[in-house]
Amino acid sequence: MDYADTWQAMIDHTQQRTRETPDEIWLLQHPPIYTQGIAGKAEHLLAPGNIPVIRTDRGGQITYHGPGQLIAYLLLDLRRRQLGVRELVRKMENTVINLLQSYLICAQSRIDAPGVYVKDAKIASLGLRVRRGACYHGIALNVAMDLSPFDAINPCGFPGLRITQTSELGIAASIDILEKKLVENFLVQLNSMQTNKEESLS
């Protein structure tokens, strides 16, 4: 699905939200494209070749999207959920960590660089934008894709950062299966948060 069209659809959805608008998760894949976050610096784009580059409004630096990468866009009313951005980022990271743990893969987050890593290789990127108390953008999990375009950038602004994907880690599950598991794990994270808030008020 075209990145620019999807991005505009997320903006429109967020601008048109009301207090009653349900939260949504959009699952898709993009054609090859580099996206520069609002903190992106030109020096991290080394040799893009014929792959288009678009400057977007999410946080962070430059990354690559392409076929075989699971994209989960989170369109959430943070104000209604009483959820802060830092807490949401932690929930997003834990979603991927727990998903990989179900396949006996040990992954972790990093304080200095949001995302999820297996040893020293990044397997999932995160990006968010908040407007009117609601967020969009989300999680990009590398599943079974051509990783060579990452060689043409400093991924997320880190020169030499290694990139990996589930297919390289012995996970044979298809992207369709991983989509379902990702959503299930994310909903567990959100529901756990809501339960804890309710208990603290009782």
Language-model segment annotations:
Residues M1-V118, K122-I123, S148, A172, ...:
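N-terminal lobe of the biotin/lipoate ligase/transferase fold
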Residues S125-G127:
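Beta-strand scaffold of nucleotide-dependent catalytic cores
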Residues R129-R131:
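Short beta-strand micro-motifs enriched in acidic
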Residues A134-N142:
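Conserved phosphate/anionic-ligand binding catalytic regions in large, soluble enzymes, centered on
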Residues Y136, L147-S202:
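C-terminal accessory segment of soluble enzyme catalytic cores
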